[in-house]
Design a protein with these regions (language model features):
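Post-signal-peptide N-terminal segment of Sec-exported extracytoplasmic proteins
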Residues: 39-42, 49-87, 131, 145
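N-terminal alpha-helical segment
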Residues: 38-39, 121
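Bacterial signal peptide processing site
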Residues: 34-36
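Residues at alpha-helix boundaries and short interhelical turns
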Residues: 27, 50, 63, 112, ...
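C-terminal motif of bacterial Sec signal peptides marking the signal peptidase cleavage site
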Residues: 29-32
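Compact alpha-helical subdomains of small soluble proteins
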Residues: 78-81, 85-150
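Bacterial N-terminal signal peptides that target proteins for export
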Residues: 2-22
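Short terminal or interdomain "cap/linker" segment that borders an active site or interface and mediates
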Residues: 46, 148-156
Length: 156
C-alpha cells in the first residue's frame, strides 16, 4: 500500500505530538521528584546517620562551652536532646528518620529566648558544622530548613 504525501505528513505530525506529550509528561514527573532527590542528597552530604550524630555531638559540645547558651540547656536530658535533634536533622534532610520529639513551640515555651540568644545558638551550630567539615553550601541548605522554626522558638 502506498501512502500519499498528505498521509505521511499527518503521520509525522501525530508522532511529533505524541513525542512532545511524552516529553512533557516525563519532565513533569521528574520535576516532582527533584525535591526528594535534593533532600536525600542533603542527608548524604551531611554524612548520613553517622555524620549527623557527629554533628549533633559537636553542637552539644559547642553549647556546653557557651556561658550565654549553656544555661538554657541546664534542665535538658542530653541523651534525649541528642536523639531528638539527630532525628530532626535526619528527617529534615531527607533521611530515613521520622521526628518523634515535641514541637519546637512546646520545647521552647517559657524559656524567653531572645533574638540574640537564637542567633548565638545558630552561630554555635555553624561552628559545629565548620569543625565537622560540612561544606558551606550544605550548611546553607540545612540552615534554610531550620529557619522556619525560628518563630516557634523566640520569645515564648
Amino acid at each position: 500500500m502506498t501512502q500519499t504525501n498528505s498521509q505521511v505528513s499527518t503521520y509525522l505530525c501525530d508522532a511529533t505530538k505524541a513525542i512532545a506529550i511524552a516529553l512533557t509528561a516525563a519532565t513533569l514527573l521528574l520535576s516532582g521528584c527533584a525535591n526528594v532527590v535534593q533532600e536525600a542528597s542533603l542527608y548524604r552530604e551531611l554524612g548520613g546517620e553517622q555524620g549527623i550524630a557527629r554533628l549533633v555531638d559537636r553542637f552539644m559540645e559547642e553549647i556546653s562551652y557557651s556561658e550565654d547558651i549553656a544555661p538554657f540547656f541546664a534542665d535538658t536530658d542530653p541523651d534525649r536532646f541528642r536523639e531528638k535533634l539527630s532525628e530532626q536533622i535526619c528527617s529534615l534532610s531527607g533521611g530515613p528518620c521520622e521526628y518523634t520529639g515535641d514541637s519546637m513551640r512546646d520545647s521552647h515555651a517559657g524559656m524567653s529566648i531572645s533574638e540574640a540568644d537564637f542567633n548565638k545558638t545558630v552561630d554555635l551550630l555553624i561552628n559545629a558544622m565548620d569543625k565537622e567539615g560540612v561544606p558551606y553550601p550544605t550548611q546553607n541548605r540545612l540552615l534554610k530548613l531550620l529557619t522556619p522554626m525560628r518563630k516557634d522558638i523566640i520569645y515564648l
